[in-house]
Structures are given as structure tokens and as C-alpha cells.
Amino acid sequence: MKKILALVSEPVSGEALKSAIGKTEAEQAEVLVVAPALDKSYRFWLSDPDPAIDRAEEVQQETVERMEEEGIDAAGHIGESDPLLALQDALATYEADEIVLFTHPDSDRSFLEDGIVDQAAERFSQPVRHIVVDR
């Protein structure tokens, strides 16, 4: 069984994963959904991480529910605010075969701005796939 680590900043459907890696492969995979607790800069300065944690919890729960409804074995986890640290922490306990980074074209939480996709590909031994999905 293939193990996939999916990093999401917004809720993602099982269909998005199926279109990314193939329907059969997605339905036979075990997926760990990681939603980083992404802080807006002003929240960081106010030292109030709760809204970011609450949002990450919502994102991972909704993503896991969507994937399970579409026949994908998924579990969720809230990660560090730094997406690379969130991936690193998850990989310490979850032996993923592949990392899939989901971004949204209009999201203010885009990992692209910070070069997260390229950095993840350089840092981790697993193949990294980047998928842009509509909301």
C-alpha cells in the first residue's frame, strides 16, 4: 500500500488526489493529510496562534472527510506554521512514499510565494508532486 503525505492549506477533495496520482492508486493508498497552522503576520506579532490552529483543524478535518467519502483511506494532522517543518515532523512518524503539495491559485496562503515546493523537493528524499486545485 502506497503511503502519501498530503500538505494542504485549504480543504481538498479526494477527486483532486485521484486526478493527481490516478483513481486506483489513490483508492489503494493510505493518506496522511497535514494542514499547517499558517499564521498571518499580524497574528504572529499579537502572539495569538489559536485562529491559525483552529483553521488548520477545520482544513484537515474537511479534507479527511472528503477523501473518505470518495473511498480514500485518510487521517489528519495539524502541523507547524512553517510548511517545511510540518512536513519534516510528519515524516518523523509517517513513512511516506510520496509527498503531494496542494495549492490554490487564489489563496493568500500560497506555498509558491515562499518557494516551499522547490525547498521540499530539495530537502526530502520522497518524490514531491505539486498540484494546483480550484476551491
Describe each region flagged by the PLM.
Residues 3, 98-100:
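Structural motif
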Residues 70-98:
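Structural beta-alpha unit
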Residues 2-47, 130-133:
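Small/aliphatic-rich secondary-structure junction motif
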Residues 122-131:
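Glycine-rich, aromatic-bearing surface loops/beta-hairpins
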Residues 102-119:
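Glycine-rich, Arg-bearing micro-motifs that act as flexible, cationic patches
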Residues 48-57:
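Glycine- and acidic-residue-enriched helix-capping/strand-helix junction motifs
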